Amino acid sequence: MSNTLSLIQSNASNPKVWVVIGVTVAGIVILAETRKRRIRALREEDFGAFLDRFELLPFPPPPPPAAKQSLSGLTFSISDAFDVKDYITGFGCPQWKKTHEAAEKTAVVVTTLLKNGATCVGKTIMDELGFGIIGENKHYGTPINPLMPDNVPGGCSSGSAVSVGAELVDFSLGIDTTGGVRVPAAFCGILGFRPSQGTVSSVGVLPNSQSLETVGWFASDPSVLCQVGHALLNLSAVTHRRQRSLIFADDLFELSDIPKQKSVQVVRKAIENLSGYKTPKHVNVGQYVASNVPSLAEFCEQSGKSQNSASTLRALSSVMLAIQRHEFKTNHEEWWQTCKSFLGPRFSNDVVTALKSKNESIKSLYRVKNEMRATIQSLLKEDGILVIPTVADPPPRLNTKRNKSLNEFLDRTYALSCIASMSGCCQVTIPLGEHGDRPISVSLLTYYGGDKFLLDTTLDVYASLQDQAKLASNLAPVSDTNGNMEASEVMKEKGNAAYKGKQWNKAVNFYTEAIKLNGANATYYCNRAAAFLELCCFQQAEQDCTKAMLIDKKNVKAYLRRGTARESLVRYKEAAADFRHALVLEPQNKTAKVAEKRLRKHI
């Protein structure tokens, strides 16, 4: 029996002893609570994003006449998978950290950013050993989602996403294997870029699954996103104007319950007033993949019916996860076998499943992957950009148990993320505001090696996307939104075809049907106005343009067409005002310049 216990027992009836014990216990409780509050305060200060705070200063700028460092004055954070000299890379796992030495060199990508003038301010929390897309870490805590504090931030690069979303840094680095940059970017309402697989150096980055993963980055500002991309990919600053062909993945947007007027229609409207964009196309990605990736049939669920889009993408994502488990086990099984006796049981289910997986059908897995890259290349060619939802669901609540609902969430999320992971193509996540209290995002995906093309497109379309997203947020919901949106777009496309064929009356009829299905689309009114102008129905054209402006005040075409209608009605002063307004919105518009100059003679 200990001396302390003997003393207590022998003086159990002495009230002074109990006072001492009470004070001692109270002191311990107070100290514990003080420590909790201190930890809580530190987490609130940086949203729980950082694991280690330090400062890596940029390299000295080169002497003139060398160009200025492109990232000068910017700060960034890095996930716990990147080596920093004299620091142990923990891989989001204390057991890993205990069994490894400090890095001898800093990761190449980090050094590249320092050479370009940026300052690294610390390492951020990530999902354990790079697994998962939820963003929770049972060892270090879960970073706080700046947009939805009661919900997960997304992973595996959770801390890096939060550090940008909370405006703690200008940009950050993360790892994207099965969605580790794209998903948290969507959940935190920021930009996230996954480059073409293998195009950014992985030297000094701990591998999870090397044939799937790539270094990715986050930013809130599209210009910063592009500057980082130019530095890491060593891209030319010269921009060649190219045509772009957007292809909407209709079946993938059906996975999401976000109204299409806040996703698909936002993208459509954003490119209508931009030059260099072809008429959008549509594709059923699931059917396209099923038809062009024959090796995938081996992994599809057996049924008497033909495979639908959802089952095809589930099969594709299952192949992706099987490759991830196989490569992770190959990379780290030796460490596990050597150290498991003293590592303890606290590993995530994903890690344990990977380490216990059996390597079956490996050749078939990689055959699917190779066919998938060729399939997406064939679909997109050299100017195609696939438009898909980044995620189908809002971020789950914190500490959600692994149940049927969460498994379905994971299935839908992986069905979307596997397209880029399995093809190796580049993908950017772009925020589009909010629906209710949840963030909305859309992803643009282009062919392997088209990183500069995608970065330039992001910079070109971003401002217009944000304008249209704000307009969409103020519109009243359209009943039966998804169905009516699709039908109205079909009518609009028929109207466009009739217009090109100079069948003006048919065009008017088709546009009228589109308006009946969706009266909140400015383009439908504006297009019908163009057809009315060809029919010399100037008053109807004027009315349609006015309606279009009430929906979209920045619709340049509406001002141009109303100006033309008013000029034809000999209302020169009003017509001139419309053309001047068009020039305010688009100063280099030649049609408006010529018309405004012409009308001066009549006023």
Swiss-Prot record:
Localization per Swiss-Prot or TrEMBL: Mitochondrion outer membrane
Highest classification ranks of the organism: Eukaryota, Viridiplantae, Streptophyta, Embryophyta, Tracheophyta
Protein name: Outer envelope protein 64, mitochondrial
Keywords: Acetylation, Membrane, Mitochondrion, Mitochondrion outer membrane, Protein transport, Repeat, TPR repeat, Transmembrane, Transmembrane helix, Transport
Effect of disrupting the coding gene: No visible phenotype.
SMART domains linked: TPR
Tissue expression profile of the protein: Expressed in roots and flower buds. Detected in leaves.
Membrane topology, record value: Single-pass membrane protein
One Gene Ontology cellular component annotation held by this UniProt entry: mitochondrial outer membrane
Source organism of the structure: Arabidopsis thaliana
Transmembrane in keyword set: yes
InterPro entries according to UniProt: Amidase_dom, AS_sf, TPR-like_helical_dom_sf, TPR_rpt
Cited function: Chaperone receptor mediating Hsp90-dependent protein targeting to mitochondria.
The keyword Lyase appears for this protein: no
SUPFAM superfamilies: Amidase signature (AS) enzymes, TPR-like
A biological process term (GO) from this entry: protein targeting to mitochondrion
N-acetylserine PTM sites in chain numbering: 2
Gene3D superfamilies for the chain: Amidase signature (AS) domain, Tetratricopeptide repeat domain
Positions annotated as TPR repeat: 488-521, 523-555, 556-589
Transmembrane segments: 16-32
